[in-house]
Amino acid sequence: MHITLRRLDGLPSFRQQRVGKLLLALLREKNDERFQIVHFSIQTNHLHLIVEADNRDVVRRKMSGVTIAFAKRFNRLLGRRKGKVWDDRYHRRDIKSTRDMRNVLRYVFGNAKKHGLIPARAAILDGYSTAWLFAEWDRPLPRVVGGEHWPRPRPRTELLLYSCGVEGELIVTEAPRSS
């Protein structure tokens, strides 16, 4: 499934080094066998997750844990006792086919290009995503900008295991269309 989470306006960018590290540490902490974050993309004001979960109840509990824990730690980082961080609850979209999975991967990995953080047609992967861990690119792995290390994903579902084998490789220079 594809999960999106947006922060309120006026707060520091999620791509600032100290905020990004805080967010990555929390995502690592919440990642387990029942709720696996297979891929992600951290943007300035929002976050995309591609997850595999045992069921919707696990997703609800884990995402509640992510949002609450991040808000507390983020507020502490900003020197605030409390304060709203998230614009709304998370948005979840189930991925139903290999073509849909390929399109979601392209969108998530290319989101920094869509928002102008990386030149649109550049053969550069976003280091604030797991794009550099993805094996089905149309050419040898291009250079990565910024970011942190993430454990190599071990997808369990056929959609993640075979989507690009069925639908074709992702094109490094491709950027998602604006919505």
Q: Where are the regions that the model predicts?
A:
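Short Pro-Cys-Gly-centered "Cys-loop" motif that presents a nucleophilic cysteine in a tight turn
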Residues: 1, 5-45, 52-179
